[in-house]
Amino acid sequence: MADQLTEEQIAEFKEAFSLFDKDGDGTITTKELGTVMRSLGQNPTEAELQDMINEVDADGNGTIDFPEFLTMMARKMKDTDSEEEIREAFRVFDKDGNGFISAAELRHVMTNLGEKLTDEEVDEMIREADIDGDGQVNYEEFVKMMTSK
């Protein structure tokens, strides 16, 4: 399944993997998964975290390594995000609930994820998604961005 990913996607997932893998040992534990989920405003229980790991933990060692992570991401991409998941993600970014994601809100979430972006990078991300050119991302634009492969 992971063999259907492009080089670029694999590189992106490698970057995402290292955001999760806080201690850099090449595996993601339930603790590390929990940290990232919480930084995204989610509050999973220990059991839910364990389930998430078990779902992709091919060798059964209780952690996720990069190949397992790739499989998980490929699977997620195949059953493309449901409307509800996208709406949920939008809510995480839209801190003040005004229906738009501003550069400041985007920067805030990315920083929480441990992703230090320059103002230029944040502006570039907004520009890429901002179809109507108002300098922020509305829900429709967000959906387009999330569903365009």
Curated annotation (Swiss-Prot):
Q: Ranges for the EF-hand domain?
A: 8-43, 44-79, 81-116, 117-149
Quote the Gene3D superfamilies the UniProt record gives: EF-hand
Any idea which positions bind Ca(2+) 4?
D130, D132, D134, Q136, E141
Q: Does the keyword Repeat apply?
A: yes
Domain of life of the organism in this record? Answer: Eukaryota
One Gene Ontology term of the molecular function aspect: calcium ion binding
List the protein's name: Calmodulin
Q: What does this protein do?
A: Calmodulin mediates the control of a large number of enzymes, ion channels and other proteins by Ca(2+). Among the enzymes to be stimulated by the calmodulin-Ca(2+) complex are a number of protein kinases and phosphatases.
Its source organism is Metridium senile
What is the additional note? Answer: This protein has four functional calcium-binding sites.
The record, for Pfam families, names: EF-hand_7
Give residues annotated as binding Ca(2+) 1: D21, D23, D25, T27, E32
Binding sites annotated in the UniProt record for Ca(2+) 3: D94, D96, N98, E105
Modified positions (N6,N6,N6-trimethyllysine) in chain numbering: K116
